[in-house]
Amino acid sequence: MAFNLSKIFAHTDRDPLIRELTLDSRNVRPGDLFLAVPGIKVDGRAHIADALKRGAAAVAYEVEGATVLPITDVPLIPVKGLAAQLSDVAGRFYGDPSRSLNLVGVTGTNGKTSVTQLVAQALDALGQRCGIVGTLGTGFYGALQSGRHTTPDPIAVQAALTDLRKAGARAVAMEVSSHGLDQGRATALAFDVAVLTNLSRDHLDYHGTMEAYAAAKAKLFAWPNLNCRVINLDDDFGRELAGLKQESRLITYSQLDSSAYLYCRDAKFDDDGVRATLVTPQGEHFLRSSLLGRFNLSNVLAAVGALLGLDYALDEILKVLPKLEGPVGRMQRLGGADKPLVVVDYAHTPDALEKVLEALRPHAKGRLLCLFGCGGDRDRGKRPLMAEVVERLADGVWVTDDNPRSEAPTNIFDDIRPGFVTADKVRFIEGRGQAIAELIASATVDDVVVLAGKGHEDYQEIDGKRQPFSDLEEAATALAAWGPEND
C-alpha cells in the first residue's frame, strides 16, 4: 500500500510517495511517514533525526512544544494536536476499513475478551467471518497474533482492520479499553454496535478517579452514527448510561431487572455450564451455554445483544450459543475427575475475583483455594480490596507475584496484607511457580484451586523484562506430579 503524502496531509509543498506510517523511529524504513508525537514516557520528536537517517520520506510532528528540528530536504509537517488526529490520519491512509465492516466495540472493566470472542465465534457460525482485536491479540478465532495492548495504537488499529478485511473479515469484534478511548486510539473508527459489560475499580493509576474512568468508557456510547448500544442493567454505571438519551437503538440485558430487553431468569448452573430462560418482548426462549458462572451468563447476554444489534434473529443466535467456547485463560479448567479441579482465570480486580470465586463455590465438594497477586506499578489502592475479597470467599489463600514490573514483590505484599483480617493464616510466597506447585500439591481431590490474575499470559514482567511463564503450564506440571498420597 502506498499513497502520496497529499492524500494524508493536503497542505504540503512536496508530495512524496508514502509506503507506510509509523510512530516508532526504530521501525522506520525508506518511504515511511514518521509521526512524531509526545508520549507519556517518550517524546517522538526527539527521534526525528533517527527517522530521517532510516529513510523517512516525510515527518509530521506535534508543533506545540517543538524545539529545534533537523535541517533536511524531507518534508517536515507541523501539526497542532497531532496525537488526537492519528486515528483519522491512519484512516485516510488505509482507506477507512471500518466503514466496510460490521464493527462491534466492547468496553467494560471485566468481560471484554469473553464477549468479543463469543461474538466472533457466533458470527463465524452464522456465516459472517469475524475478526478480533483485543487482549489476546488480533486475527481470527483460534489464530490470534498477540499484541501488547488491549486497544492497539491508532495506526496499528487501522492497519489491523485493513488486514482483517483483506483476509475475508466482514465483521470485527474489538475490545475498546478506557486508555484507548481516553487517548483517542479509535476516534476515526465507525462502530456499529457498542457493548458495556460492567464498571468496577481498575486503572485508577491512570485515570485518577472512578468518575474519570467512567467518563472514558461513556465516550463509546455517544459515538457518531452508532447504530446500537448494548448495556448491562445489573451494573450501576450501566443503568446510568442506559438512562441517557441517544439516537441509537438501545438493547439492555439483565439477570435481575425484568424490564430489560434481554432478561434471564431461572438460571441453573452445573459442571456443564448453564441453562436458563431468556425473556424478551417477543416471548420466552431456552438459553444454553457451556460457560461456567453467573458472570459468564452476563457475558453471553452481552454477546446476544450485540448480535441482535447486527440484525440477526434471536432464534438463530440461540442455536449457536451452546457451541461457543470461553477464551484461553478465562475460567479455563484443568484436572478434575481423580485430581483437584484447577481453574485458571485472568481476574485481576476485586470485582472479577469476587465473581470467579462465587461462581466456583458450588463446584467445590471440599475447599475452595485461591492464589492471587497484584501487578506492580499499577493501582495500589485495589491491593487490600483484593485481599478482603479472597479471604471472605475462599477457604485457603496463597499470595504470590503477579507481574511485579519494577516493584519489589515484598512491597506489593505489604500493600496487600492490611486487607486481611487474619493475615497470619495466609501463605505469602515469592516465586509464582513455586507457589502454584505448593498450592496444588496441598489440594485434595475434592478441592477447587483458583489461579487468578494472569490467565492467558505466557510471560511474567520482572524489572522491565518479560520472562516466559504460564499459569496453565505450571498448573499442568503440578497436576502431573499430584498423586493419591496428596489426598
Curated annotation (Swiss-Prot):
**Residues at which UDP-N-acetyl-alpha-D-muramoyl-L-alanyl-D-glutamate binds:** 23, 25, 150-151, 177, 183, 185
In what way is this protein post-translationally modified?
Answer: Carboxylation is probably crucial for Mg(2+) binding and, consequently, for the gamma-phosphate positioning of ATP.
The record's subcellular locations are: Cytoplasm
In this UniProt entry, the residues modified to N6-carboxylysine are 217
**Primary location:** cytoplasm
Q: Which domain of life is it from?
A: Bacteria
Function of the protein:
Catalyzes the addition of meso-diaminopimelic acid to the nucleotide precursor UDP-N-acetylmuramoyl-L-alanyl-D-glutamate (UMAG) in the biosynthesis of bacterial cell-wall peptidoglycan.
The text of the family note is: Belongs to the MurCDEF family. MurE subfamily.
The entry's protein name is: UDP-N-acetylmuramoyl-L-alanyl-D-glutamate--2,6-diaminopimelate ligase
Species in which this protein is naturally found: Pseudomonas syringae pv. tomato (strain ATCC BAA-871 / DC3000)
